[in-house]
């Protein structure tokens, strides 16, 4: 008899896996109404235009990074490590929001098993409607396509399945919103930071950096900013007497975004005499353009030009054992 399993879906943004994938990736990103809230009738035409305009410039970033984002490989490795921890009672799959493997690919994998429950586990420690919320919405949309027979062709790979629609119309789905203050997650962050610090780290200034958001989203009630600040505060309880601040990166467009911006904060700190910086990505758990290009290349060069004596960027968690343990605990608590 086939054993029933709990499906675990790791949700992440995704990134282009080749230079040719950059424009369609950007198109998918700017087509997301949870991020860019413009009238829906013009959303896709605007997304097509923006993606074409930005693709050439973005391609240069990815050429510096080796021609692709490493996020897919790192997320799949996180899934593999988590699968090993959970063993055969669970089936762990990956659903990216803007590039392969997409949500429907994750659903196809789950269809091959006898699933009794699904747990959605975002790889975004802090909740935002633009990240976790968007991934939840996309998952809900794709599930509805599966349980509407005859309207969509996505079930063609399931030929011979006795009753494919039974699955997602009857299975309970648990959604983990966030874990920004989870003790194991904080422990993972602290361990990862300590493992990459120089001996004289107390002579450094800790600069935490997170993905920025339009200020209006926060004013409308999104908890992302407050949760990110809480994460930083909990981490810094383990580093007494070290000076620190939080900044935001990756602003796009003319509207007002969360500040201070990371590059401007670097400039301010160096001008004020803090010439030894430890830069800590706090909202990312894998490497991508915002860490490898912005933090390492762009901001690293800015710091050097401004006279920084040392600029150390802490790696993201990736498959850090304590982070995988965090994910395991979250899954078990929601099983």
Swiss-Prot record:
EC number: 4.98.1.1
Organism domain of life: Bacteria
Gene3D superfamilies noted in UniProt: 3.40.50.1400
Pathway(s) it belongs to: Porphyrin-containing compound metabolism; protoheme biosynthesis; protoheme from protoporphyrin-IX: step 1/1
UniProt keywords, alphabetically: Cytoplasm, Heme biosynthesis, Iron, Lyase, Metal-binding, Porphyrin biosynthesis
Residues bound to Fe cation: 211, 290
Pfam family, one: Ferrochelatase
Reactions listed under catalytic activity: heme b + 2 H(+) = protoporphyrin IX + Fe(2+)
Major localization listed first in the record, in broad terms: cytoplasm
Compartment(s): Cytoplasm
One Gene Ontology cellular component: cytoplasm
UniProt enzyme class: lyase
GO BP field: heme biosynthetic process
Gene Ontology molecular function: any one: metal ion binding
Keyword Lyase: yes
NCBIfam families: hemH
Function: Catalyzes the ferrous insertion into protoporphyrin IX.
Family affiliation: Belongs to the ferrochelatase family.
Protein name: Ferrochelatase
Source species: Sulfurihydrogenibium sp. (strain YO3AOP1)
